[in-house]
Design a protein with these regions (language model features):
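Peripheral, non-AAA+ core regions of ATP-driven protein-machinery
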Residues: 1-183
Length: 183
């Protein structure tokens, strides 16, 4: 497992305690299956934290099985932005998940999965308490300015503005298509 995954234990424990929840006195074992697939990233923190809260009786553990959770937990209990939310939500939708709890800062990107009105219900939260409230059906405060737009309207120059330099333009197109750096 990556260092980020190994550090998640402390992030989750501190986040739960600093949010006013108890943490189990006994050892907590979390199985991330399938074991043969390498786990990396902090996007599993929220799912693990909610699993612990469900096991401790803070939430209905059976109801939690129907909800997808994405997000990193800070030491203070905030639910932090993660990368790659859109493909995760699309994968959850394909697996039959109808509700997804995610960081408020990822909401704009996640809403791309709901274009045309389809896709899972999205519950954007800022901290662990809001996450618990959301899964219990309580109203959470509007996100307001906390939500960062995923797509910005920007006017970009394009290659029609450049005369000549055909080899350089072709190299740039190939580099971008392959997600390679240009510099």
């Amino acid at each position: 497992a990556s260092t980020t995954v190994m550090e998640s234990r402390e992030r989750i424990k501190s986040g739960l305690l600093n949010s006013g929840f108890e943490y189990p006195r006994r050892r907590v074992t979390v199985t991330l299956i399938p074991a043969g697939i390498r786990k990396n990233g902090s996007h599993l923190d929220l799912a693990i934290a909610m699993g612990i809260l469900g096991a401790m009786g803070y939430a209905d553990a059976d109801a939690l099985r129907e909800i997808g959770f994405i997000g990193e937990i800070s030491l203070q209990g905030d639910v932090c932005r993660v990368e790659g939310v859109l493909p995760m939500i699309l994968g959850m939708e394909k697996a039959g998940i109808r509700r997804v709890v995610l960081p408020a800062e990822n909401l704009a990107e996640a809403e791309l999965a709901r274009e045309g009105g389809a896709g899972p219900e999205l519950l954007a939260v800022r901290n662990l308490q809001e996450c618990l409230d959301a899964v219990q059906g309580k109203k959470i405060p509007p996100q307001g300015e906390h939500v960062r737009p995923a797509i910005r309207e920007t006017e970009y120059a394009d290659f029609s503005d450049i005369s000549g330099q055909e080899n350089a333009k072709r190299a740039a197109v190939i580099a971008v298509a392959g997600h390679h750096g240009l510099i």
